Design a protein with these regions (language model features):
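Hot-dog-fold acyl-thioester-processing enzymes
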Residues: 1-49, 106-120
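HotDog/MaoC-like acyl-thioester-processing domains
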Residues: 1-5, 60-61, 72-120
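Short, well-ordered turn and helix-capping elements at secondary-structure junctions
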Residues: 11-13, 50-57, 87-89
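Hydrophobic beta-strand-centered segment that forms part of the acyl-chain substrate-binding groove
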Residues: 34-68, 72-74, 78-80, 96-101
Length: 120
């Protein structure tokens, strides 16, 4: 799997439990999946499905969040990407898996219509 995004979890993204809001992490997973699609084949992609999503452990303020991605499947117009978010806690611990997901993206043209993915 490829490291697609690294970002620090900041206090302004906390929820009522004083952990990082799941929607913040979800948006970064979505962006990391797009990075994987663009690295696989340049073009414009739209997220069409979150096929699987599992929050394993909480993310805390100060954690360094690293999102790893890998292509699971390439279809005629779509790419399915496996995503794994891991963190390094502020105490310098080893990477801990916090979230896993499987997202599907469709390649589109300028009119947002599906476009065939060329086999490389």
């Amino acid at each position: 799997m490829n490291l697609s995004i690294s970002v620090f979890a900041l206090p302004k993204y906390t929820n009522s439990k004083n952990t990082i809001f799941g929607g913040w992490l979800l948006s970064h997973l979505d962006l990391a999946g797009l990075v994987e699609c663009r690295n696989t084949q340049p073009g414009r992609y739209l997220t069409v499905g979150i096929d699987k999503m599992k929050f394993v452990k909480p993310v805390f303020v100060g954690d360094l969040v690293k999102i790893y991605t890998g292509v699971e499947k390439i279809g005629r117009t779509s790419i399915t990407v496996k995503l794994v978010a891991k963190v390094n806690r502020m105490n310098g611990s080893d990477e801990i898996t916090v979230t896993e997901g499987l997202f599907t993206y469709v390649k589109t043209n300028d009119e947002n219509e599906p476009e065939e993915i060329k086999k490389i």
